């Protein structure tokens, strides 16, 4: 299974792209729903693939953790008035909804139980 979206969002590999979700977040100070859902879809696919695995490939775990920590740190910077970084295209309530979904999807991946997307306030609900 490909890790194309994960690699696009991981700055320390050749496949990284500035027009990925994390690239846009960094370079344009904007949250791209379109790019986020590409990454999320891949997390659901990878979760299905590794559902019965006792161990996950280290390179995949490192890249997932780095993407997670970068995005959560960036959201923290947005809410820190002394930081100077602001996600320009969302108000605080929109960002809270996106942060919640992002966090629960990543936590669900590591737990091995992906959340049902119909429970989220924001975004698509195409997964039961």
Where are these regions (language model features)?
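Short terminal alpha-helical segments
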Residues: 1-40
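Alpha-helix boundary/N-cap detector
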Residues: 16, 34, 38-41, 55, ...
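Charge-rich, solvent-exposed alpha-helical interaction surfaces
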Residues: 9, 24, 42, 98-101, ...
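Short, solvent-exposed, charged loop/turn and helix-capping segments
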Residues: 45-61
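Amphipathic alpha-helical binding modules
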Residues: 67-128
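Short helix/strand-capping turn motifs
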Residues: 7-9, 58, 62-69
């Amino acid at each position: 299974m490909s890790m194309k979206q994960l690699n696009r969002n991981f700055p320390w590999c050749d496949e990284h792209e500035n027009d990925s979700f994390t690239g846009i977040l960094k370079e344009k100070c904007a949250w791209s729903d379109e790019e986020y859902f590409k990454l999320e879809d891949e997390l659901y696919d990878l979760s299905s693939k590794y559902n019965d695995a006792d161990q996950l490939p280290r390179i995949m775990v490192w890249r997932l953790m780095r993407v997670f920590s970068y995005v959560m740190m960036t959201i923290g910077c947005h809410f820190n008035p002394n930081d100077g970084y602001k996600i320009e295209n969302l108000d605080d309530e929109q960002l809270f909804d996106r942060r919640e979904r992002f966090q629960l999807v990543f936590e669900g991946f590591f737990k091995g139980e992906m959340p049902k997307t119909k429970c989220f306030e924001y975004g698509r609900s195409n997964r039961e």
